[in-house]
Amino acid sequence: MVGSGVGGVDKVVQPSLKWEGSLWQQGMRRVAGVDEVGRGALAGPVVAAAVILPAHLDPEALSGVRDCKQLRPPQRAHWAERIAQVALAVGIGSASAAEIDQLNIRQATLLAMQRALAQVGEVEHILLDGLPLAELGSRQTALVKGDQLSLSIAAASIVAKVWRDTLMQSWDHQYPGYGWRTNVGYGTQEHRLALQRLGPSPQHRRSFAPLRDLQAGEIGG
């Protein structure tokens, strides 16, 4: 059933297999946690990941997995590698800046999620961070702050974050001056000042307000 958005956690907590376990007890084995990163960035793609963990996994196998925002880059890199070893399936999907401009950020995020899910094969149920997305079908449970509650959603957040950060940092050489090695496309003051100085690159989201303001000659630091 489509979840209505339950949950809500602020402090640093260890995600659990509570939600996955309930579905496993119903006989489902291919439960995919899905999360996205990069939704609010000014440049680069929005990226989603889908992670299917083995039924009845010992949570100690992924004991350090948290919402990606609660981990430092070396920790994220370590756990992304460990997730790849432990998971039954991992899928990564992205939607480019051009697709974001063409579709809008919501539809592009949905597209990235659909692309990630297409890589993991059969999915019996989706655990989704945030609010329900009817386009993903009826077999989903949406959890507010799900990346802090569900281990598979937290795992997806890490996989997506590491993949996107690595891409943006590699583009720092191709598109120098914007500071992507550190800001990975987000709208820091350094990035906004670089936009004033250099103008947008092909990887910038021209439909986003700061870029629209730039085209109108109004962007500021």
Curated annotation (Swiss-Prot):
Compartment annotation: Cytoplasm
GO biological process: DNA replication, removal of RNA primer; mismatch repair
Region described as Disordered: 198-221
Annotated a divalent metal cation binding sites: 35-36, 129
Residue ranges of every copy of the RNase H type-2 domain listed in the record: 29-220
Statement: the UniProt record of this protein carries the keyword rRNA processing: no
InterPro entries to which the protein is assigned, alphabetical: RNase_HII, RNase_HII/HIII, RNase_HII/HIII_dom, RNaseH-like_sf, RNaseH_sf
Family matches, as SUPFAM superfamilies: Ribonuclease H-like
The protein's name in its UniProt record: Ribonuclease HII
Organism listed in the record: Synechococcus sp. (strain JA-3-3Ab) (Cyanobacteria bacterium Yellowstone A-Prime)
